[in-house]
Amino acid sequence: MVALLLFPMLLQLLSPTCAQTQKNITLGSTLAPQSPASSWLSPSGDFAFGFRPVEGNTSFYLIAVWFNKISDKTVVWYAKNTDQDPSIVEVPSDSFLQLTNDGALSLKDRSGQEGWNPQVTSVAYASMRDTGNFVLLGADGTTKWQTFDMPSDTILPTQVIPCNKTRNKSLRARLDINDYSSGRFLLDVQTDGNLALYLVAVPSGSKYQQYWSTDTTGNGSELVFSETGKVYFALTDGTQINISSGAGIGSMADYFHRATLDPDGVFRQYVYPKKANAGILGGETWTAVSMQPQNICHAIVSDVGSGVCGFNSYCTFDGTRNQIASCQCPPWYKFFDEQKKYKGCKQDFQPHSCDLDEATALAQFELRPIYGVDWPLSDYEKYEPIGQDDCGRLCVIDCFCAMAVYNQSTSTCWKKKLPLSNGNMADYVQRTVLLKVPSSNSSQSMISTSSNKWKRNRKHWVLGSSLILGTSILVNFALISIFLFGTYCRIATKKNIPLSQASSKSQLPLKTFTYKELEKATAGFHEILGAGASGVVYKGQLEDELKTNIAVKKIDKLQPETEKEFMVEVETIGQTFHKNLVRLLGFCNEGAERLLVYEFMTNGPLNRLLFDNSRPHWNTRVHIALGVARGLLYLHDECSKQIIHCDIKPQNILLDDNLVAKISDFGLAKLLLTNQTRTNTGIRGTRGYVAPEWFKNIGISTKVDVYSFGVILLELVCCRRNVELEVVDEEQTIVTYWANDCYRSGRIDLLVEGDDEAIYNIKKVERFVTVALWCLQEDPSMRPNMLKVTQMLDGAVAIPSPPDPCSFISSLP
């Protein structure tokens, strides 16, 4: 036993007395954690391979590669057990690592039990290179194994990660900056040729959601960190998608470089000056020079998992140039573990017991306002119209309610329950979050002093903006196609079958109204909201407890369809729901009367907002564009059958009280059957927004909606109609022509002249215009699908320069 204990000490005596700078590492060389020979250096001394103490627990060590000449010895690679078990190799101080005389690299503990080896044999020597790559080589100089082939969370200049045909190669973020355990984010170089970032489960690593990608399925070749400092994804056709440009970041001679998937899910490229106060970046610290995605707090909204931060917390930024995400608890909440904030937050008081009666609950709890935080999910009830006091009372007496959200302008109240997910700072909605906490008169005290401290200083906690409304999981049923629904009413009437019973399969959760009910609700169909080809829309109010505002459409023009086709279509549409589709509340099928009842959209159609004298804020227009894109994506790709809207225009995009865009009026919609990508039909839509293929003898596809969206996107950017005959410069008459000319001449700024907010965000303006020009390609096959469109708008994928569209004929009135 004594011999075993003395063995590592004997190895230290036989080994060199310090970490040596050497070109080759010979067989028999040994490292031990607490000996002078604890690492092998590269020839320049820039990098080291060996034992690195674990932060916070110096009794244990990693097998790692690190930058050796900088003060914090930044780790760029660390050993993991196996692909099947990606846990880190963490060993006690009496372990040793040896390049054995048998030609193997072996990590053993004091008893001689092997704890790790890279599973290669016949090694003749090893080398720690100045690139940061530790290599095991054969006698003929061929590489047997290298750390560059087994990346952890970082890549270095000259490192290449190819798309493997049989197994994904990936970077896995750490769990925390000082915790090297496999974390919650993954950069995947996939076998299908795509490079993507994923939110993943811990510890299993199963993928939750992709939140950024190059969208290069079938075309990707390799992820490259060039020796000039440029990070890009090479494609099989020889082109490159830049992850970072490499421009303006200083020479490789003056700076150390690395690109790391950080614990907050952002893939950042960093530089560090090799000399004190060197270069324009200055400072002896790592500085981020590029990052993907640009705003991680807004990039992830996942139905599964907690989002960027843990449950019941929210994501903001640390205020530094590196834009590191910072997770925070709302007031009266505290972290489960201050050292592991990714675990989320919990209430710092005794939760509301469901055994309390209403009077006791009102005595023990109250609501306190907070501002500027957004938890987009977790809604479970909505009240409208209602006062703020009543909104608060309904939350206080409900043991499931953790907070209420109130909109003063529309008298609307939403209740949210725990756990709260996807929390982030938000600056684009004016609403108040009412957080349920112990009453100031209650005998219940806060559990920790941190919450009391916040309570005393809560006036300083105002964050300066308000909460975005999440989608209610109980109330987001999309409206049924007017055309299809009217036909269904006629079929059901002819057969003397009540509409609600005509299909036992569809089981649509819709209310049946009588004609008298709707006549009374609309005060005799008095106030007209709008009119379309199939009928007139009136404003009304239901006589329910909440006095719900509604929009009632009287259908007066129907076309016959076969019952079989209609039943297939109505069942499909009736089962759809999305926050960017207007919700159908019910219907009337009484005699010859056909009426549809919709949720009322406070701010009316987009054209009213967009083309009035006052220009909407740039961020408002951005959110509207993204909302319309996501609504179309749902119709095209996420329904059981694809739905082509066929009439996307500003008049058919309605805005709720928070200016959330919702697609409406499915009167011209067309469904595609399974495995069908095109359909033949007569010309539908509105002049100025219909795609060129409508005028040709070819089938139409979802790409007609993509074309219409391209027109609307330019209207949102420019805040003007597609065609304006009274402009001074006739070259600006048709916005699609004008935008193309501005893009080709490099004068995108002319499209937003006088719009200071847009000018400030000119890069995003250019991105939106580029996406629009892709949508407006005359050849439908050249247009992106709506998934690609949303990714391009979000900045999740690179956007190549669009071809010059051959024709904008359909934009003409």
Swiss-Prot record:
Chain ranges of the EGF-like domain? 293-346
Q: Which cysteines are joined by disulfide bonds?
A: 297-315, 309-327, 329-345, 391-413, 395-401
User: Per its UniProt record, what Pfam families does this chain match?
Assistant: B_lectin, Pkinase
Q: Record-annotated residues binding ATP?
A: 529-537, 553
**According to the UniProt topology, which residue ranges lie Cytoplasmic?**
488-813
Can you tell me which residues the record assigns to a coiled coil?
Answer: none
Query: What is the taxonomic lineage of the source species?
Result: Eukaryota, Viridiplantae, Streptophyta, Embryophyta, Tracheophyta
All copies of domain Protein kinase, residue ranges: 523-797
Name this protein carries in UniProt: G-type lectin S-receptor-like serine/threonine-protein kinase LECRK1
Q: Which gene encodes it?
A: LECRK1
Q: Which residues lie on this side of the membrane: Extracellular?
A: 20-466
Main location as per UniProt: membrane
